[in-house]
Each structure stands twice: as structure tokens, then as C-alpha cells.
Amino acid sequence: FPRGIKAVCGNPKKRFEQIKLLRKKNAGIQRPASIFGGASMSKAMSLKARIRNIARQKNIPAQVILQNYMFERLLVRLSASDYKEKFVLKGGMLVAAIVGLDNRATMDLDTTLKNLPLTPDAIHSALEQICAIRFDDGVSFEIGTISPIREDDIYGGYRVMLNAWFDTIVTPLSIDVSTGDAITPHAVQYNFSEIFDDEKTYELWAYNIETVMAEKVETILRRSVFNTRPRDFYDAYILATTQKFDQAVFENALQATANHRDTARQIEDVPGILRNIEECPELKTMWERYRKQFTYAAGIEYEQIINVLKTLLGINAIAKREAPVTDK
């Protein structure tokens, strides 16, 4: 792992710049020469060709496919390790697995720990053993820095920076690790499909869909008009409109999430918060930029998202009950 690179955990823009810098520095690192000579380059070129093919099919940037492929190879190792029961997947990687990578691009991996101390030493030891598991995929991993996450005190935890190597290709990875989240009613075992072969799957523990939705909606309500993450709105919308879920379990999960994050009082005025979000010009502009950036969001109007949130939170039902009855 190149010296002089430390995880920047505050500003997301700085975090992105850090990964770009890391990738640039890694470009100059020489890996041991392959005993097969030119075969080494052909392996790298073959992987890039497969990635470009998937990228064209799904209309996703090739770098996103590469990043997710390397995460996949790490998760396959996790599923074969003694730590399979101790890491629970959540966040964007899980949403992408549920709705499909062509419907949700992600560049990060989020997990919560179960029955494992949330300390740098424990995290490093676990990842070291996971990364040491050998598969016939040509991928290897190097653990870099493990630093406290300071961007949001509600979550806490640590951010791990790794390098994934495939021949001459190096890919920086970022993993957020936290603990103590309220998973309502409990985590579930989920089968993840591999990128290059849908019929190949690996099993890991993950948040149930109602808890995923609850965390997104709590974040939307808590951040209100100060939200700078349009993906929160997209995730809540795409999960609510494409997946089966239990409304009662979602409501319980939302309450449990708010209690755990100590935000129940802060978000109790749901109609007022949603009204502010609905009328906020900055959020509307932010959403329009997101629609232009990601083709999978292009057909979703801001008003549609607001309407789905109102339905999820019972506002539409309340409005219907309170609507005045008129004579016909």
C-alpha cells in the first residue's frame, strides 16, 4: 500500500479525490513480473474486455463494474470464511444487489458487525484472514488504512481502504464498518449473484428490506432540506416501487431506527418535513442533476418521489381520510 495515503473521512468530495490520488499513485507501482511473460497482459486485457461488454449491456461506466467486481471477489471470500456470520451487509451495495447494478450504481461497501469488537485491530485481523482465502480468480487484496469515520456522528465506525489487484490492474476499495444498528426484526440471509454469471451465487447476511428502507427514510426526514445525497431519495423510491415489503414491519423498523439514532423527536413532524422537502428548490435542482447523471433515474420526476414518501409514511392515507365530502 503506497505510503503517504491516509483515509480522508470527512468530506465525500475529499474522499473521492483521495481514491483518485490513490489510483494515480498505484499506476506507478510495479508488481512482480509474471512467469508467463505476455500472458500477464492478456489476462488484464481479457478482464477489461469482459467488463466493457457488461458496461455496454447495462449502460454503466466500466469503472463501476470493475469496482463492484472487486467487491464481489472480497465478498465471495467473506462467504467462505469464519467471519461470514459476523459481517452484515447494508447500504448501496445491498440496494444494487436487490434492484440490479443497472438500476443502482455504487462504489462503496457498508457493513455492520455482529459479535465482533468494533476496533481497528479486530477489523484488520478479520479482513486479513478473509483476504488470505485463495480462489482461482487471480485477485489479491492489500489492507491499507483503517480510520475513524467522522462525517456523521450518528453512524460512527471505521473506514477501511484496501487495494484489489488483478494482474496489472489495481483498484482502490473503501469499506465502512459500524456496529449496533437496529435491524428490525432481524438480519436475513441473502443470495448475491455474481457479475459475470447470474447462476453463480454466494450467501451472506444482510439487512432485511424494511430496515434498508427505514434507514433511507429516516435519513431523508432527519436531513430534510439540508440533504446533499439524492441517492437517498432514489433508493427509497426504487425499493418502495419495485420490491415486496411489509408495511407494518417498515413502520416498526423506522421507529426503531429513529430511537437508535436518537432522532424520534427530530422527525416526528412528518407532514411538515415532507412539505418543506416538496417545496425546496435546491432539492429539486439537485434531483434534476442526479437524473441527468444516471440514466436509471432519468424517468423519475421529483413529484413521484414525494408521492411515494407520502404513501410510505401514511400522509396520503391521512389526507384521503380528512378530505371534505362534497355533494355530487
Region spans (language model):
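Hydrophobic alpha-helical membrane context
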Residues: 18, 25-26, 120, 244
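Cationic, low-complexity basic patches in intrinsically disordered or flexible, solvent-exposed regions
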Residues: 15-21, 31
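Structured mid-to-C-terminal alpha-helical surface segments
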Residues: 35-87, 96-105, 109-328
